[in-house]
Design a protein with these regions (language model features):
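Conserved catalytic core of two-metal-ion nucleotidyltransferases
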Residues: 1-5, 48-107, 126-174
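Aromatic- and glycine-enriched beta-alpha-beta binding-site module
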Residues: 104, 116-118
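Non-catalytic, alpha-helical, charged scaffold/linker segments
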Residues: 121-125
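Short hydrophobic/aromatic beta-strand micro-patches
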Residues: 35-37
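Conserved aromatic-histidine-acidic binding/catalytic patches
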Residues: 32-33, 87
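A short secondary-structure junction signal
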Residues: 108-115
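Active-site nucleotide-donor binding segment shared across nucleotidyl transfer reactions
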Residues: 2-32, 41
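Short, conserved charged micro-motifs
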Residues: 42-46
Length: 174
């Protein structure tokens, strides 16, 4: 689909580390991680439903209301892989590939400060909801996932949250 639609995509996170440093997969990282620039991500989300072969399912908060994450997963519905953190949810639990949007970090210093302030504000607000030993972005994602599960009104603002959280951390994208 990426090739057919001429979409730009990247291998990221543990998948990129495994490919570069280990020449394959990292044993403790059991999924594949792909990221697309926001515009390409939106095209993929829009087109995937009618282009995916039988048995594959694009999972996100638009396709399954109970899905607790702010990115998408491409699931194989003919398989089962239970993630401990979401095992009780009534959602598709097939083997998956994580698909993340990448948002451009603003070039304007004022916009950068506002974005960083918004990230900090969200982090502080969410840290009150649930204390954790995790820090930084991992903690923020954990808190958002819990909010999605327990507090349905967060879905109303998910696009804004996605854009704040998927901007590169202090790096401007080209």
């Amino acid at each position: 689909i990426f090739s057919d639609l001429k979409l730009t995509y990247y291998l990221v996170c543990g998948s990129a580390l495994g490919a570069i440093k280990y020449g394959g997969f990292i044993p403790w990282d059991d999924d594949m991680d792909i990221a697309l620039p926001r515009d390409d991500y939106e095209i993929f989300i829009k087109e995937a439903g009618c282009r995916l072969p039988d048995g594959l399912f694009l999972q996100n908060h638009h396709t399954e209301a109970s899905f607790p994450q702010i990115f998408s997963k491409l699931r194989n519905s003919r398989t089962t892989y239970i993630e401990k953190s979401i095992s009780a949810l009534p959602i598709n639990h097939g083997v998956y590939i994580d698909i993340f949007p990448l948002d451009e970090y603003p070039a304007d210093r004022g916009a950068q400060r506002r974005l960083e302030f918004e990230k900090q504000r969200l982090f502080l607000k969410l840290s009150v909801v649930y204390c954790s030993k995790k820090t930084g972005r991992a903690a923020l994602y954990q808190h958002l996932n819990r909010l999605f599960h327990y507090d349905r009104h967060v879905h109303e603002n998910v696009e804004r949250l996605e854009r704040v959280l998927t901007c590169s951390n202090g790096q401007r994208s080209d």
